[in-house]
């Protein structure tokens, strides 16, 4: 089970960190769940619950009495501590047990981050509640960010996680093959293409890498809405158009995020071939420098320099993001040092992280040429997980 692998990984991360304990504090997770919780406890909670990983390697789950048996059955927690009336006394007792009195200023890591939504899982209300519970104890004023544990825990994939991601990629590539060999017809609207893909996903029991509404992104020709838009019933696929699709499938709770494009016609015009070659070369430039130890913004700069050197405007987004349980999975971002990205582009790439490499250019008379690949970081570089698209494909049906 993946959560057992991730708990073991968490033990090592906490042991090597500046934290005394890492504390994930949640309640009623049906509508609002801390993004890290499914990594370490793949079970929805009902009452206030505290999941603690100590520097010693011991793990504790302080949970409501009716949740306790399920957490024991999941395994991985050294002690499951149930409560009925209030979590406060049990939680403080576990902190006393795990943090020696010789530690004069304990560091209790909680899930907060100003730059990473996947590491920012504690709500403001739960933060205030936890703060009030610790008042008057030796742990008052000891809450700090655990992003130095949460971010690498999510980012650095286990073998089981990589296997699930590769499965999602294969499913996505299979849907692209089905789409152009069987389903898509010239004259179809964006919405028809979008609905057909969703029907196949639902029929086969897959999930979505991001919200169902707007997945996949479908663009037909030059009049289509760029970016994360909704498909149109009025815009149709015609001769001379580029069909562009951005699709993220989730299988076994892990996602893909892949973009592909096709030209509608008997042959690809030279100016579109040139654009495609420039996009592929920019992805190559990013892949050439993507390796452990490099900062995310440096990878983006390599791709940005390549696309502008080819005569095209720079893209208005990051060249790559991490993929895991979600298509956009937080952590180090392969993006420019813009305010909107916080410190994510300053992060350092590490082995076993999975990233996209993506960018595109708009062709005024045809549509968007945009490709998105997926790679995994190796010991000294990166390896493509997707079957690459390196030339514009033709769609003549």
Where are these regions (language model features)?
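Active-site neighborhoods and metal-handling regions in enzymes and metal-associated proteins
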Residues: 1-397
């Amino acid at each position: 089970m993946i959560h057992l692998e991730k708990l073991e990984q968490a033990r090592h991360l906490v042991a090597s960190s500046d934290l005394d304990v890492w504390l994930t504090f949640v309640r009623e997770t049906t509508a609002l769940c801390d993004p890290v919780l499914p990594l370490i406890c793949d079970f929805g909670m009902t009452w206030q619950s505290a999941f603690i990983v100590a520097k010693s390697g011991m793990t504790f789950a302080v949970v409501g009495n009716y949740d306790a048996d399920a957490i024991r059955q999941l395994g991985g927690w050294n002690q499951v501590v149930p409560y009925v009336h209030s979590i406060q006394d049990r939680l403080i007792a576990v902190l006393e047990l795990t943090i020696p009195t010789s530690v004069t200023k304990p560091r209790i890591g909680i899930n907060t981050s100003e730059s990473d939504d996947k590491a920012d899982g504690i709500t403001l209300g739960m933060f205030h509640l936890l703060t009030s519970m610790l008042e008057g104890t030796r742990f008052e004023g000891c809450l700090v960010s655990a992003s130095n544990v949460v971010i690498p825990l999510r980012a650095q994939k286990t073998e089981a996680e990589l296997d699930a991601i590769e499965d999602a990629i294969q499913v996505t590539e299979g849907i692209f093959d089905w789409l152009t060999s069987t389903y898509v017809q010239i004259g179809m609207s964006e919405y028809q293409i979008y609905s057909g893909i969703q029907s196949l996903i639902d029929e086969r029991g897959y999930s979505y890498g991001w919200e169902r509404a707007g997945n996949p992104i479908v663009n037909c020709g030059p009049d289509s809405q760029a970016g994360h838009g909704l498909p149109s019933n009025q815009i149709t696929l015609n001769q001379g158009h580029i069909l562009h699709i951005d699709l993220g499938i989730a299988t076994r709770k892990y996602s893909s995020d892949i973009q592909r494009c096709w030209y509608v016609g008997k042959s690809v015009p030279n100016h579109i071939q040139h654009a495609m070659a420039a996009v592929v070369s920019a992805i190559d430039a990013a892949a050439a420098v993507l390796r452990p130890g490099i900062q995310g913004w440096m990878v983006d700069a390599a791709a940005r320099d390549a696309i502008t050197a080819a005569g095209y405007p720079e893209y208005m987004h990051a060249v790559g993001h991490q993929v895991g349980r979600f298509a956009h999975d937080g952590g180090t971002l392969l993006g420019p040092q813009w305010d909107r990205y916080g410190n994510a582009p300053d992060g350092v790439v590490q082995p076993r992280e999975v990233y996209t490499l993506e960018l595109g250019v708009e062709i005024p008379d045809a549509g968007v040429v945009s490709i998105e690949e997926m790679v995994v970081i190796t010991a000294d570089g990166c390896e493509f997980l997707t079957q690459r698209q390196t030339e514009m494909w033709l769609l003549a049906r």
